[in-house]
Amino acid sequence: MFSILKQGVISKSLLAATSLKATASRFSFSTSVASRVDGTKNGWSFTASNVADQTTDIGINSESAMSCNDQEQPLSFYVQTVRDDLNSPNWGAEQRKGAFDWEVSA
């Protein structure tokens, strides 16, 4: 799934998220894709949250990933509500598809 990301843009953020998760016994993540009804824009999103304190550790979506211009960004750049981009007014009418919520217990 992550092979489609630009290498070096998000890799350090993903490593940071992994280290955040190493101390948690449970965490959840969700994935989703959406497209505008008129077919002019498509996108995806991924987020992971610590179940214990309900905080979102990392949120990645196609808009923020593409706007980096191949520059590495701090983890805080990606910490956002997962649907901020997919549901933004800029998208207009949209169709959501393939939204999944997952939970992992160690």
From Swiss-Prot:
Q: Which UniProt keywords apply?
A: Mitochondrion, Stress response
Q: What happens when the gene is disrupted?
A: Leads to reduced growth rate and altered ROS generation during stress conditions like heat or treatment by hydroxyurea.
Task: Provide the Gene Ontology terms for cellular component.
Answer: mitochondrion
Per the entry, induction is: Expression is up-regulated by heat and in response to hydroxyurea. This regulation is under the control of the protein kinases sty1 and rad3.
Lipid metabolism: present as a keyword of the record? no
Q: Where in the cell is it found?
A: Mitochondrion
One GO biological process from the UniProt record? cellular response to oxidative stress
Chief place where the protein resides = mitochondrion
Q: What does this protein do?
A: Stress-responsive protein that may play a role in regulation of cell cycle.
* Designated name of the protein: Stress-responsive protein 1
* Native species: Schizosaccharomyces pombe (strain 972 / ATCC 24843) (Fission yeast)
> Taxonomic classification, please?
Eukaryota, Fungi, Dikarya, Ascomycota, Taphrinomycotina
